[in-house]
């Protein structure tokens, strides 16, 4: 709709338009607000919305112009999906006018456009003033420049940048980023977290702009929320809602029957559905985050299986490989669900294979916080300790960033109600399947449950501490012959077990039913469900408003009389002998010794985008303290693949200064220092080939020299290389001794190892292997075959330049269709890279000869090693498409399927 201008008016450009109502006392007149530009001058045009449009008023946008959003009176309570907002407008010589815009999102967009226009107008008139006194400031994250590879070859790559050695394949972003927590730094890519239902409840105008005229509105709002939470009992009522929770391992099958016997088995439709699947897709591609058609198949099957008596809407979906979690709610309850966030954690080998791990969703329903976790833990009877570790890893690594809020990330346990479902894979400590089946036939389930590993581990407080589980009155849900009710009749003859479980923690949770559903026979597992009555905190608006106003009055009075103050127990921290992938913690306390509540946060230093270096993390990094309240803060140092290279090369040190900022108060400075022990992990192949001794025995100055020498100079004359031993001049090793030691061990001892490169190693053993390679040239490698295999993968992933150099990445993709060209490309690699590639291919071809024993397939090996050997350059990582990945896999298959002569 274009505004109609008076006759003789100069042409203008209509930039933005929004319809609303002008408030004149009790009257509401329809109108249209238009942001326009004429001859370089921005204007706000107010038009009547009658039968004939005409200009009622034109207000110049200049330094005296004001257009602000009004704060609402009902604050921080239930979120409506689109509540509208009110604005005030005043020009140079015009009275203040009030408008109501029904569509909140359009209103906020219009306000931002007007603000941008006003800023643009002011910049035309007044030079920009820079505040030199603001020494510390929070800056937006900027994309760091992409560095070209370290290594080159021949004359085609003379323009390479050989100076930068930082492994930037996963650069951290944002000041709220979490450094990779131990034991693994895997984080699911945004594509895998993408929700199918994008119509989320909106955050209201009020929650974003609590006190519009106040320059510190965000800080004040946070404090108010903090105190409101403390006084929650004064304004909430407990109301019961019905939650249906279901879990099913579908063994890679597609739905072949209705899910109503599982999802629609109660006379009264539940208010909320939480449905978890495991082994949704068992294809190799799915293991490495490719799209899965099974996701859509099962999501549609769930929707068709929901009760027809009620209307449901999908709240969110999250998937990691074969684990999928869906949450549905009755349509009339969706408006009370807000602050939705999802997260995934893979506990498979290196996090590359997300076949095990967990997916989770958190949300606020009315005023109660929920976290729903769907997990698939490690398999095999004897691996109960690995299952315990998987559970701990998920708890430690899974944290949620709440959308549209600047609050710290919240972990699983920081919710009012946690529901944990899935194929937890805990078995029975009874080896005789016939004895177990006999007890089942006699319905002596309680005798069997005494041997249930999950019950034993919970009793010993080694896993799922503080969780509850309902009484199990159904027979084991694993393992059956698919499409039948018969126990496993295969050669393995699995012992029946209650693998599929539902647990919970929190108050006001009452389980009504806990059952299996034998009618569904698609999989070798049977689905399980639980029905809960959960007491939810519902806000009483009248009492809420009274508490809110009381808090505001108290804060107004105290803010005028007192300034915040903190006391720190320590300000200097020393981290000694920091190692790759080995966590170190130092703790200290901060106390609010002032008279008012305060908000603290670690903030970036000048010109920084993060409050600390990538290898450091403060937990929590921000929060609120009431007078006389004390909190423990942990400073964690963890060197991951993203920071190991620059620490190895001496470009970075274990040194940092943290700025702890107190709102309305002063800044406190924390000094971080320490020493780092270099590792062969994260060191370039060229440097390692020239080291005849373990890296810890090489002087630091020599390490720096080795990393700074360019490959082009080394290729010109091998005899002119900097020797490690004084007075000698030796050719480099054909391949790094570390790679040879790992591969040789696997070749000798692991060719028959079941599920090699598919089962993660133990973290303690991985650390022993890393230390062993850094400090010695061992005759044997410590640890299990699985740990040695994962150590090899970690080594390849940590290389600053992959085995196939970044410069050849695109050429490899382009030549994937022609084996002859593929071999030509490999011949152009630098010598040590070429040798390593051929050595690894020879080993993998040998490994594939024993696939009947080790369950290693060509496609699985190609997919796994492609992600390590043929990585896209950092600047192309985010733009890599499924087609690119498939071509990269095809390139590697040329060598895996080729002859030994290749």
From Swiss-Prot:
The keyword Oxidoreductase does not apply. It catalyses: a 1,2-diacyl-sn-glycero-3-phospho-(1D-myo-inositol-4,5-bisphosphate) + H2O = a 1,2-diacyl-sn-glycero-3-phospho-(1D-myo-inositol 4-phosphate) + phosphate; a 1,2-diacyl-sn-glycero-3-phospho-(1D-myo-inositol-3,4,5-trisphosphate) + H2O = a 1,2-diacyl-sn-glycero-3-phospho-(1D-myo-inositol-3,4-bisphosphate) + phosphate; 1D-myo-inositol 1,3,4,5-tetrakisphosphate + H2O = 1D-myo-inositol 1,3,4-trisphosphate + phosphate; 1D-myo-inositol 1,4,5-trisphosphate + H2O = 1D-myo-inositol 1,4-bisphosphate + phosphate. A motif (Clathrin box 2) lies at residues 703-707. Detected in brain oligodendrocytes (at protein level). Detected in brain oligodendrocytes. Its EC number is 3.1.3.36, 3.1.3.56, 3.1.3.86. It is found in: Cytoplasmic vesicle, Phagosome membrane; Early endosome membrane; Membrane, Clathrin-coated pit; Cell projection, Cilium, Photoreceptor outer segment. The record marks 758 as: Arginine finger. Residues 163-172 have a biased composition (Polar residues). Pfam families: Exo_endo_phos2, OCRL-like_ASH, OCRL_clath_bd, RhoGAP. Keywords: Cell projection, Cilium, Cilium biogenesis/degradation, Coated pit, Cytoplasmic vesicle, Endosome, Golgi apparatus, Hydrolase, Lipid metabolism, Membrane. One of its GO terms (biological process) is cilium assembly. Residues 1-122 form the PH domain. The ASH (ASPM-SPD2-Hydin) and RhoGAP (Rho GTPase activating) domains form a single folding module. The ASH domain has an immunoglobulin-like fold, the Rho-GAP domain lacks the catalytic arginine and is catalytically inactive. The ASH-RhoGAP module regulates the majority of the protein-protein interactions currently described. The ASH domain mediates association with membrane-targeting Rab GTPases. The Rho-GAP domain interacts with the endocytic adapter APPL1, which is then displaced by PHETA1 and PHETA2 as endosomes mature. This is Inositol polyphosphate 5-phosphatase OCRL.
């Amino acid at each position: 709709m274009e505004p109609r201008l008076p006759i003789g008016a100069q042409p203008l450009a209509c930039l933005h338009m929004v319809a609303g109502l002008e408030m004149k006392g009790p009257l509401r007149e329809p109108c249209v607000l238009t942001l326009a530009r004429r001859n370089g001058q921005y204007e706000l045009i107010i038009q009547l919305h009658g039968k004939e449009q005409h200009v009622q008023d034109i207000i110049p946008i200049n330094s005296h112009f004001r257009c602000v959003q009004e704060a609402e009176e009902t604050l921080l309570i239930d979120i409506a999906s689109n509540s509208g907002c009110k604005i005030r407008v005043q020009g140079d010589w015009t009275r203040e006018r009030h408008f109501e815009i029904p569509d909140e999102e359009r209103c906020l967009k219009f306000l931002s456009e007007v603000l941008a226009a006003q800023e643009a107008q002011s910049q035309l008139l007044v030079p920009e003033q820079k505040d030199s006194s603001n020494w510390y400031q929070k800056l937006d994250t900027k994309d760091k420049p992409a560095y070209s590879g370290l290594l080159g070859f021949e004359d085609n790559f003379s323009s390479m940048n050989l100076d930068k050695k930082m492994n930037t394949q996963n650069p951290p972003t944002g000041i709220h980023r979490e450094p990779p927590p131990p034991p693994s730094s895997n984080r699911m890519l945004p594509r895998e977290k993408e929700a199918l239902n994008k119509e989320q409840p909106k955050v209201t105008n009020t929650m974003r702009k609590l006190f519009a005229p106040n320059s510190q509105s965000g800080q004040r709002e946070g404090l108010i929320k903090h105190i409101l939470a403390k006084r929650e009992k004064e304004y909430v009522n407990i109301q019961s809602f019905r939650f249906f929770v279901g879990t099913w391992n579908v063994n890679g099958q597609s739905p072949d029957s209705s899910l109503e016997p599982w999802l629609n088995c109660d006379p009264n439709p539940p208010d909320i559905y939480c449905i978890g699947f495991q082994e949704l897709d068992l294809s190799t591609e799915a293991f490495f985050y490719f799209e899965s058609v099974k996701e859509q198949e099962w999501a549609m099957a769930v929707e068709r299986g929901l009760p027809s008596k009620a209307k449901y809407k999908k709240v969110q979906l999250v998937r990691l490989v074969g684990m999928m979690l869906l949450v549905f709610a009755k349509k009339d309850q969706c408006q009370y669900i807000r602050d939705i966030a999802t997260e995934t954690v893979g506990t498979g080998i290196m996090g590359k294979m997300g076949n095990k791990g967990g997916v989770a969703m958190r949300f606020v329903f009315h005023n109660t916080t929920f976290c729903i976790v769907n997990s698939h833990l490690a398999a095999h009877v004897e691996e109960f300790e690995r299952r315990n570790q998987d559970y701990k890893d998920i708890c430690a690594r899974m944290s949620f960033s709440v959308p549209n809020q600047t609050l710290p990330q919240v972990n699983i346990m920081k919710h009012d109600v946690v529901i944990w479902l899935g194929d937890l894979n805990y078995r029975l400590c009874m080896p005789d399947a016939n004895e177990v089946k006999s007890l089942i036939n006699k319905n002596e389930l309680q005798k069997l449950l005494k041997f249930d590993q999950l019950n034993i581990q919970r009793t010993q407080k080694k896993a799922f501490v503080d969780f509850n589980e309902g009484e199990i009155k159904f027979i084991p849900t694993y393992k059956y012959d698919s499409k039948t009710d018969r126990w496993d009749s295969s050669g393995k003859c699995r012992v029946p077990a209650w693998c599929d479980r539902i647990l919970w923690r929190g108050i006001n949770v009452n389980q009504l039913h806990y059952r299996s559903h034998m009618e569904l026979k698609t999989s070798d597992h049977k689905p399980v469900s639980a029905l809960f009555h959960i007491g939810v905190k519902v806000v009483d608006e009248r009492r809420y408003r009274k508490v809110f106003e009381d808090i505001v009055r108290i804060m107004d009075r105290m803010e005028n009389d007192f300034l915040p103050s903190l006391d720190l127990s320590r300000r200097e921290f020393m981290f000694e002998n920091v190692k790759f992938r080995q966590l170190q913690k130092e703790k200290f306390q901060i106390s609010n010794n002032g008279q008012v509540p305060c908000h603290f946060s670690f903030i970036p230093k000048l010109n920084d985008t993060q409050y600390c270096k990538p290898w450091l993390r403060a937990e929590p990094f921000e929060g609120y303290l009431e007078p006389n309240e004390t909190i423990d803060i942990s400073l964690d140092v963890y060197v991951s693949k993203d920071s190991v290279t620059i620490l190895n090369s001496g470009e970075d040190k274990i040194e940092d200064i943290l700025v702890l900022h107190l709102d309305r108060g002063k800044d406190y400075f924390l000094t971080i220092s320490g020493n780092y022990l270099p590792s062969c992990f994260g060191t370039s192949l060229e440097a390692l080939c020239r080291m005849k001794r373990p890296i810890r025995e090489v002087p630091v100055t020599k390490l720096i020299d080795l990393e700074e020498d360019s490959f082009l100079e080394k290729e010109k004359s091998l005899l002119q290389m900097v020797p490690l031993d004084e007075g000698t001049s030796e050719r480099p090793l054909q391949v790094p001794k570390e790679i040879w030691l790992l591969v040789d061990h696997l070749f000798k001892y692991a060719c028959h190892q079941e599920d090699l490169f598919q089962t993660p190693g133990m973290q303690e053993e991985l650390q022993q292997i890393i230390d062993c390679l850094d400090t010695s040239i061992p005759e044997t490698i410590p640890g299990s075959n699985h740990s040695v295999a994962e150590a090899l993968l970690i080594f390849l992933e940590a290389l600053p330049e992959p085995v196939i150099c970044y410069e050849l990445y695109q050429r490899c993709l382009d030549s994937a269709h022609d084996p002859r060209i593929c071999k030509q490309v490999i011949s152009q690699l630098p010598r040590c890279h070429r040798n390593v590639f051929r050595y690894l291919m020879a080993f993998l071809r040998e490994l594939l000869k024993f696939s009947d024993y080790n369950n290693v397939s060509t496609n699985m090996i190609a997919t796994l090693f492609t992600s390590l050997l043929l990585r896209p350059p950092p600047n192309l990582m985010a733009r890599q498409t499924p087609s690119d990945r498939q071509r990269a896999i095809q390139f590697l298959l040329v060598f895996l399927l080729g002859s030994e002569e290749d």
